[in-house]
């Protein structure tokens, strides 16, 4: 099985989830979307499980591949409002890897792990899937857009999303599902960093 996996926290990210599903649909078996009741800081989410309110924004013919996980992690996060180290090493890592505890996977399953605003080009899927068969785990390089979706950050690499066989991370929990031992040699998509209004921030 081939899975695209992400998590989201805000209505402004729905458009990115739709883009990822549209690009990936012909190449994946399922799109795992996790929504959490807590934030990276360890504080409660401002929006309590809103994904189902937006499901009708996805084309009906594409919804069959969505697996929506409503994730309660209030007893698992650590308060980290003033502690970036704990926020990144524990809370963020938990949110990236929590899906492992909610579904069953086989060793040879492939997981493409992206943040909500990281979009993989559909035409690059055959190449990255071939690469993961050869290497087991690969970091993906994206074009970086900042603040507006047409503000390209020239000469900026964004190397963070990971594509890996499940067996590469199955003995870590929660696994970070970021980066990788090698980086795919071409840019394979776009990262829309802080592409939102001031109110949405």
Region annotations inferred by a language model:
Residues 15-19, 42-46, 79, 120-129, ...:
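A short acidic (Asp/Glu
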Residues 1-26:
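N-proximal low-complexity "stem/linker" segments adjacent to membrane-targeting elements
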Residues 34-42, 192-197:
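Short, solvent-exposed beta-strand-terminating loops
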Residues 5-11, 34-35, 113-116, 140-143:
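Short His-Asn-centered micro-motif
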């Amino acid at each position: 099985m081939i899975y695209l996996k992400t998590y989201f926290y805000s209505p402004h990210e729905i458009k990115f989830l739709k883009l990822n599903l549209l690009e990936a649909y012909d190449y994946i078996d399922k799109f795992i979307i996790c929504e959490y009741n807590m934030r990276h800081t360890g504080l409660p989410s401002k929006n309590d499980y809103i994904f189902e309110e937006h499901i009708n924004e996805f084309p009906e013919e594409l919804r069959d591949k969505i697996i929506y996980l409503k994730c309660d992690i209030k007893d698992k996060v650590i308060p980290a409002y003033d502690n970036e180290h704990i926020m990144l090493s524990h809370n963020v890592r938990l949110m990236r890897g929590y899906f492992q505890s909610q579904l069953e996977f086989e060793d040879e399953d492939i997981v493409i792990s992206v943040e909500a605003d990281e979009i993989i080009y559909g035409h690059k899927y055959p190449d990255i899937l071939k690469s993961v068969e050869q290497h087991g785990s690969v970091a993906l390089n994206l074009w970086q857009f900042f603040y507006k979706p047409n503000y390209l950050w020239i000469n900026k690499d964004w190397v963070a999303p990971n594509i890996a066989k499940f067996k590469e991370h199955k003995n870590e929990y929660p696994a970070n599902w970021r980066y990788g031992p090698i980086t795919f040699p071409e840019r394979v998509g776009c990262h829309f960093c802080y592409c939102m209004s001031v109110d949405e921030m």
